[in-house]
Regions:
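Conserved short histidine dyad/triad with adjacent acidic residue
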Residues: 87-96, 108-123, 240-256
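Ligand-binding loop in jelly-roll beta-barrel domains
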Residues: 158-184, 282-285, 291-318
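Bacterial N-terminal signal peptides that target proteins for export
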Residues: 1-9
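Glycine- and acidic-residue-biased ligand/ion/polar-headgroup-sensing regions
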Residues: 125-138, 258-271, 275
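Short acidic-glycine-tyrosine-enriched beta hairpin
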Residues: 143-158, 276-292
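Bacterial N-terminal signal peptides
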Residues: 8-18
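A short, N-terminal "cap"/entry segment at the start of jelly-roll beta-barrel domains
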Residues: 24-103, 184-238, 320-330
Length: 330
């Protein structure tokens, strides 16, 4: 059954923002200014700039948020059933819901039935990341075999034959990220397997009074690293998880053209703050912020348990975008 995407009054958001500002009344400092890859922070909330008037078509934000339950099933690698969430389209004006990707090929929800296996397959001119959401299984590529369970991530390079198997009475379910490879790209010859719980946890990039304990930036983002170009990514530049502890939120901020950043919910319900709208985001839902340098976004965890996201992104070429910082006060 397709889930309803519920608009929420901005009153609750304003309450949360006011509370966050009251609790973080430290004096403004130089702080970390690097605005890429989720490790930055504005020097202070005063640097978030809002449009002077409400965008007449701002409810178009619903085109940038999608749920796999609204998609028709298709098959990949034989018996792996995919339900698309985000697909190729336009970063700014998608022709249909979820058709927002310019660089990546797709983000889908995958399901392998109990005790089933895929056909021996090779990815041609494309690569995939499998992030396991539930079930038990194993994957074999070349001479390597790895066990699959919740929060195991697998990077499968192009041209490497592999087989995935479900080894329990529960379906093996996952997010599937698919990226293209350029013509002159030389893929890795082995798959990479990461246990998310053992991934490197980032620390703050600079002295920011607004970052909560344990987070690495954007106020409340707890980041664990999965895959980067060093692991073999061709188009995407970062695959990580981001966790928000109970009653915390990310720093509202925009993205500039060329930044394709995806947030797919893994655990917990949260609030996606997009432009001037709020939507409930549940596991199985993902969004991309329009990278127009003015529409802001944040993820808000108003619950009593952690909320975790799978994040992947392509950044503008040569990106070192910086926000201006106020002069230090004496």
């Amino acid at each position: 059954m397709k889930r309803a995407v519920l608009p929420i009054s901005t009153f609750s958001l304003m309450f949360l923002l006011s509370a966050a500002t009251a609790q973080n009344s430290s004096p403004t400092g130089g702080g970390a200014q690097n605005a890429i890859n989720g490790i930055n922070s504005y020097p202070g909330p005063e640097f978030v700039k809002y449009e002077p008037e409400r965008e007449a078509l701002d409810r178009r934000i619903d085109l940038f948020l999608n749920d796999w339950q609204g998609s028709m099933p298709r098959h990949e690698h034989g018996s792996l059933v995919l339900r698309d969430i985000l697909t190729r389209g336009d970063n700014f004006a998608p022709s249909e819901k979820g058709a927002v990707l310019h660089y990546g090929n797709f983000l889908a929800y995958g399901r392998l039935s109990p005790w089933n296996s895929t056909l021996p397959s090779r990815l041609e001119r494309q690569q995939e990341v499998f992030y396991i959401l539930g079930g038990q299984g194993e994957i074999t590529a070349g001479s390597d075999t790895a066990a699959l369970r919740k929060d195991i991530a697998v990077f499968m390079p192009a041209n490497l034959e592999f087989v995935m198997r479900s080894t329990s009475a529960e379906p093996l379910v996952m997010y599937v990220i698919n990226e293209p490879t350029p013509a002159d790209f030389h893929p890795k010859t082995k798959m990479a397997v990461k246990d998310e719980s053992a991934g490197h946890q980032r620390t703050p990039a600079g002295g920011d009074p607004y970052v909560v304990p344990g987070a690495s930036g954007h106020w409340g983002h707890i980041v664990r690293e999965l895959f980067s170009p060093a692991d073999g990514l061709a188009t995407e530049q970062s695959v990580i998880t981001v966790t928000l502890n109970p009653l915390t939120m990310g720093e509202p901020h925009p993205h500039r053209p060329g930044q394709e950043e995806i947030w797919a919910a893994i655990d917990g319900d949260s609030l996606a703050f997009l432009g001037t709208e709020i939507r409930i985001q549940r596991p199985g839902m993902a969004y991309m912020l329009p990278p127009d340098a003015s529409t802001i976004h944040s993820n808000i965890n108003a619950s009593n348990r952690p909320a975790k996201f799978l994040y992947f992104a392509k950044f503008p070429d040569g990106d070192n975008w910086r926000h201006g910082a106020p002069a230090a006060t004496r």
